[in-house]
Amino acid sequence: MSNWLKLEGDVCAVTGALGGMGAEICREFARNGANVVMLDLDEEKVKAAAADLAAEFGIHAEGYKMNATDEAEVQAAVDATIANFGRVDVLVNTAGILRFAAMEDLPLSDWEQVLNVNLTGYFITSQRFGREMIKAGQGRLVHISTVASHSPETFSGVYSSTKAGVNMMSKMLAAEWGPYGVRSNCVEPCFVKTPMSANFYADPEVEKSRSRLIATRRIGEVSDIANAVMFLASKRSDFTTGDAIKVDGGFSNMMGDLTAKPGGRRAYADNFLKNKGVELWSDESGVAKPSDQ
């Protein structure tokens, strides 16, 4: 256990705690000596997961059933947290859903459902847990957003719009609650392996082609996201608020390489990388061959 992050003894609540990212974030908190409040829809599973976490790491962990879009359930989770722990220091919002559709075909019901879970749910949990932080004069909020909040992924329906909303909500919370000692920040992942995406990356060609779009040439792991969350949730980031950390392996910096290059520049780049033993951009990535440029 490391105390560099100064998380030992803190009370850290995590929504979507049974998901890939949420579960890893809970484990990382516990590994750093924090007490953990696991929040998710399945009461039996979340209580069992909390018991396992407590037994493994010797910390205090509780699991509560909570639908982030239900004000009464959120308030009940807040009340239970205060009753059992006395306070809450950190809230991490990870719950989220995605519905694929072209905008002209997107049913209003899908729009409303994704908006409700991805944005309204983040607001409700932030507001209710945030009130306790304001009373205490300190607290840290971390919200899982996405690089797609800046550059939309087509046919992902309202997903990118909701995450852009999360970014601005976080800035609003940071601005309004900063005087009370409460900070709010986002983490923006790119391609990440989770149980939800396991089938997608089961095809090695999919993973290979996507990896080539990333500067580090690999798909992210949930541990990469958890590490960034730990920093923003810790006292080591006390002067950071209203901001976002991209955890995308440099994907956002590679846009220039996704376009055709004039003359022999693409051929030069490909030959240079090949001589260095580095993976080249592939046809599957959508980048034209040098001969096509």
Regions found by a protein language model. Name each.
Residues W4-V37:
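Canonical Rossmann dinucleotide-binding motif of NAD(H)/NADP(H)-dependent dehydrogenases/reductases
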Residues A102-M103, D110-L115, R210:
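Substrate-binding pocket helix/loop in short-chain dehydrogenase/reductase
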Residues C186, K208-T240, V247-G249, K276-Q293:
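C-terminal helical subdomain
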